[in-house]
């Protein structure tokens, strides 16, 4: 699937075309041995709503971005190393079909394809690439994954206190640990989550208590072992309450300018396959 395409002219041309579409805002993608295996449009469930995104499957990375002009211009490039990826198929419902979750240690999100066949093609190709990449690097599959953010529209009230009702004046926030939609009062705390960011992140009150308790247990074990020099003080990871706002709107900025795209139903109404895999 990979070897006969590596270092070929057609593969170089395909990768160069992807780089050109992202332009100066994207990172260089051409590397010795890297192969572009597939590409297509999937619907990504973002914080505000589901939006079409362009995806490119390479033998070692998964790349996706926002669509400005189909097959000509993309932006907001994201690169995910495949050895960090785990897939989770999601059950079908009347409102949501052909969905699966892409899980990594830093970010997890839900995507859907135009058809069951296309969904299965994406899943099988990604899983095969992940298997080969883990074999090549000798790494073990990732067992800890970031929680996917629950979409804003899923609830009108805080999912922790169940009392605060969201409005134009009372905004939603997301706990970076559990992904719940919470109010400002229920997410005043910050905690260092090294897998997600070098800076302390917003967490809900429940996750904060659990994380703080876990940290205290870890420090108690270190003290019991008699290794005070190796202690990481609780204060370095627990940052307490903060009235300042953090970045809750990556997807909103990423998706700005998508207003010209049709809704999810219209986008897939033609029944045309929006993905292609190279062999």
Swiss-Prot record:
This molecule's function is given as: May induce apoptosis through the lysosomal-mitochondrial pathway. Translocates to the lysosome initiating the permeabilization of lysosomal membrane (LMP) and resulting in the release of CTSD and CTSL to the cytoplasm. Triggers the caspase-independent apoptosis by altering mitochondrial membrane permeabilization (MMP) resulting in the release of PDCD8.
Which residues hold Zn(2+) 2?
A: 175, 178, 204, 207
Q: From which domain of life does this come?
A: Eukaryota
In its UniProt entry, what is this protein called?
Answer: Pleckstrin homology domain-containing family F member 1
Which intervals hold domain PH?
35-131
Task: Name the species this protein comes from.
Answer: Rattus norvegicus
List all Acidic residues biased stretches: 244-253
GO cellular component labels? early endosome; endosome; lysosome; nucleus; perinuclear region of cytoplasm
Q: Where are the zinc fingers (FYVE-type)?
A: 152-212
Region (Disordered), start-end ranges? 219-264
InterPro entries of this UniProt entry? PH-like_dom_sf (IPR011993), PH_domain (IPR001849), PH_domain-containing_F (IPR051765), PH_Phafin (IPR037871), PKHF1_FYVE (IPR042762), Znf_FYVE (IPR000306), Znf_FYVE-rel (IPR017455), Znf_FYVE_PHD (IPR011011)
Tell what the record comments on domains.
PH and FYVE-type zinc finger domains are required for lysosomal location.
Q: What is its subcellular localisation?
A: Nucleus; Cytoplasm, Perinuclear region; Lysosome
User: Could you state a single Gene Ontology molecular function term?
Assistant: phosphatidylinositol binding
Spans traversing the lipid bilayer? none
Please give the chief subcellular localization of this protein. nucleus
Which keywords has UniProt assigned to this entry?
Apoptosis, Cytoplasm, Lysosome, Metal-binding, Nucleus, Zinc, Zinc-finger
Q: Where does Zn(2+) 1 bind?
A: 158, 161, 183, 186
One GO BP annotation is:
vesicle organization
């Amino acid at each position: 699937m990979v070897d006969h395409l590596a270092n070929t002219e057609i593969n170089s041309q395909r990768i160069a075309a992807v780089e050109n579409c992202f332009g100066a805002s994207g990172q260089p993608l051409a590397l010795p041995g890297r192969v572009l295996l597939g590409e297509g449009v999937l619907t990504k469930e973002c914080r505000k709503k589901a939006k079409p995104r362009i995806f490119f499957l390479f033998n070692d990375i998964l790349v996706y971005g926002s669509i400005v002009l189909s097959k000509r211009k993309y932006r907001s490039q994201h690169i995910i190393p495949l050895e960090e990826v785990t897939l989770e198929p999601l059950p079908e419902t009347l409102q949501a079909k052909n969905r699966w979750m892409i899980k990594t240690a830093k970010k997890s999100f839900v995507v859907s394809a135009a058809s069951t066949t296309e969904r299965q093609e994406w899943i099988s190709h990604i899983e095969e690439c992940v298997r080969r990449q883990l074999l090549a690097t000798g790494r073990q599959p990732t067992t800890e994954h970031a929680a996917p953010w629950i979409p804003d529209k899923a609830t009108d009230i805080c999912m922790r206190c169940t009392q605060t009702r969201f409005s134009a004046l009372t905004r939603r926030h997301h706990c970076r640990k559990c992904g719940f939609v919470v109010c400002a009062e229920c997410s005043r705390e910050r905690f260092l989550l090294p897998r997600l960011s070098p800076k302390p992140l917003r967490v809900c009150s429940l996750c904060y208590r659990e994380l703080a308790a876990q940290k205290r247990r870890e420090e108690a074990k270190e003290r019991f072992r008699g290794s005070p020099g190796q202690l990481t003080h609780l204060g370095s990871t627990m940052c307490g309450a903060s009235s300042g706002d953090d970045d809750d709107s990556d997807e909103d900025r990423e998706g700005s300018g998508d207003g010209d795209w049709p809704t999810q139903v219209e986008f897939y109404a033609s029944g045309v396959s929006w993905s292609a895999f190279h062999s």
